[in-house]
Swiss-Prot record:
Domain of life where this protein originates: Bacteria
Description of how the protein assembles with itself and partners: Homodimer. Part of the ribosomal stalk of the 50S ribosomal subunit. Forms a multimeric L10(L12)X complex, where L10 forms an elongated spine to which 2 to 4 L12 dimers bind in a sequential fashion. Binds GTP-bound translation factors.
Protein's UniProt keywords contain NADP: no
Protein name: Large ribosomal subunit protein bL12
Keywords associated with the record: Ribonucleoprotein, Ribosomal protein
Gene Ontology CC annotation, any one: cytosolic large ribosomal subunit
Gene for this chain: rplL
HAMAP family (alphabetical): Ribosomal_bL12
Pfam hit, one: Ribosomal_L12
InterPro entries reported in the protein's UniProt record: Ribosomal_bL12, Ribosomal_bL12_C, Ribosomal_bL12_C/ClpS-like, Ribosomal_bL12_oligo, Ribosomal_bL12_oligo_N_sf
UniProt xrefs under SUPFAM superfamilies: ClpS-like, Ribosomal protein L7/12, oligomerisation (N-terminal) domain
GO molecular function: mRNA binding; structural constituent of ribosome
Protein's job: Forms part of the ribosomal stalk which helps the ribosome interact with GTP-bound translation factors. Is thus essential for accurate translation.
Length: 124
């Protein structure tokens, strides 16, 4: 019985980076191949290559406080650990970055928390 490509892809998708590294090494040993990348000339402009890379760091920007400023200030305090006055200054000074250099999950969580409080938020 042959294993379907989809089954293999599903199994690989569930692996950790360490497990994937071990799998690549096993392929190299079993089949006598190398996983070294072949040097290929990149695009002339370089812009397409940058766009193809997936972003790993995000900035959560508060664009507008909305009607419930008190709830937004509380959410900013929770997310940043700022004091009351500092959080109020961030909210009053919108658009302002609330979190910078965070991963996708943290950015989405912060965005949801701020939007639930009534703010308008962008993730860049």
């Amino acid at each position: 019985m042959a294993i379907a490509k989809e089954d293999i892809l599903a199994a690989v998708e569930g692996m950790t980076v360490l497990e994937l590294n071990e799998l690549v090494k096993a392929f190299e040993e079993k089949f006598g191949v190398s996983a070294a990348a072949v040097a290929v000339a990149g695009p002339a402009g370089g812009g397409a290559a940058a766009a193809a890379e997936e972003k790993t760091e995000f900035t959560v920007v508060l664009t507008e406080a909305g009607s419930n400023k008190v709830a937004v200030i509380k959410a900013v305090r929770e997310l940043t650990g700022l004091g009351l006055k500092e959080a109020k200054d961030v909210v009053d000074g919108a658009p302002k970055a609330v979190k910078e250099g965070v991963d996708k999950a943290a950015a989405d969580e912060a965005k949801k928390k701020l939007e639930d409080a009534g703010a308008k938020v962008e993730v860049k």
